[in-house]
């Protein structure tokens, strides 16, 4: 299987902002991150619509064209309530990785991705080099819900011995 991987993406689910209320005056939110058959989950943060997760989840990348999908839920005793979803295209991040940029100052911005009708970006997303790593800061507007945004930070990780991107 390792031969098919092109790299890893560390997805830091930083926080939720103004998430929907699904319980009495609040929610107990968590995020599921999916890519292809992979499914990862943050911890549940109790009684808040502005959770601070800072949970780091790692996705194995085989095909960068497959979008990363986020689903936000309110943890309940019986059935968890949906609190919105979003998709993220990681191809812009991979394009910067392919440039193999070296020797630049920390936090040098290499690319910006602007919000449009084809993506879930709430604001411009920057891809930059930090400590020799390619990173991307993202704020996603949740769909299929009245309100809410999720802040992420992505970081590309090369796999020694893989074919790379």
From Swiss-Prot:
What's the reported outcome of changing residue 23 to A? Answer: Abolishes phospholipid binding, but no effect on binding to YCHF1
Among the record's GO biological process terms, what is one? response to wounding
Name the UniProt key words of this record, in alphabetical order: Abscisic acid signaling pathway, Calcium, Cell membrane, Cytoplasm, GTPase activation, Lipid-binding, Membrane, Metal-binding, Nucleus, Plant defense
Where is this gene product found?
Cell membrane; Nucleus; Cytoplasm, Cytosol
Q: What induces it?
A: By wounding.
The residues that the entry says bind Ca(2+) 2 are 23, 28, 74-76
Query: Per UniProt, what does mutating residue 5 to A do?
Result: Abolishes binding to YCHF1, but no effect on phospholipid binding
Q: Which Gene3D superfamilies match?
A: C2 domain (2.60.40.150)
**Effect recorded for residue 43 to A:** Abolishes binding to YCHF1, and partial loss of phospholipid binding
Q: Name one GO molecular function term.
A: metal ion binding
One Pfam family recorded for the sequence? C2
Please list the residue ranges annotated as the C2 domain. Answer: 1-105
Keyword Repeat listed: no
Task: Tell me which GO cellular component terms the UniProt record holds.
Answer: cytosol; nucleus; plasma membrane
Effect on the protein upon substituting residue 8 to A: Abolishes binding to YCHF1, but no effect on phospholipid binding
Q: Which family does it belong to?
A: Belongs to the plant CAR protein family.
Q: How does it assemble?
A: Binds to PYR/PYL/RCAR abscisic acid intracellular receptors in an ABA-independent manner, both at the plasma membrane and in the nucleus. Interacts with YchF1.
Q: What does this protein do?
A: Mediates the transient calcium-dependent interaction of PYR/PYL/RCAR abscisic acid (ABA) receptors with the plasma membrane and thus regulates ABA sensitivity. Stimulates the GTPase/ATPase activities of YCHF1, and regulates its subcellular localization. Binds phospholipids in a Ca(2+)-independent manner. Promotes tolerance towards salinity stress by limiting the accumulation of reactive oxygen species (ROS). Promotes resistance to bacterial pathogens, such as Xanthomonas oryzae pv. oryzae and Pseudomonas syringae pv. tomato strain DC3000.
Q: What is this protein called?
A: GTPase activating protein 1
Organism, scientific name: Oryza sativa subsp. japonica
Taxonomic lineage of the native organism: Eukaryota, Viridiplantae, Streptophyta, Embryophyta, Tracheophyta
């Amino acid at each position: 299987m390792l031969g098919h991987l092109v790299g890893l993406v560390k997805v830091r689910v930083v926080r939720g902002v103004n998430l929907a209320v699904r319980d009495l005056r609040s929610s107990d939110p968590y995020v599921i991150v999916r890519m292809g058959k992979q499914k990862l989950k943050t911890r549940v943060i109790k009684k808040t619509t502005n959770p601070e997760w800072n949970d780091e989840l790692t996705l194995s990348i085989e095909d960068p064209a497959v979008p990363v999908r986020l689903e936000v839920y309110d943890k309940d005793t019986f059935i968890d309530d949906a609190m919105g979803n979003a998709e993220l295209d990681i191809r812009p991040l991979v394009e910067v990785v392919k440039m193999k940029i070296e020797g630049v100052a920390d936090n040098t911005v290499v690319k910006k991705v602007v919000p449009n009708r084809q993506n879930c970006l709430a604001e411009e997303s920057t891809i930059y080099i930090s400590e020799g790593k390619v990173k991307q800061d993202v704020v996603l507007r949740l769909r299929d819900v009245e309100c809410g945004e999720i802040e992420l930070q992505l970081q590309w990780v090369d796999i020694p011995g893989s074919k790379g991107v």
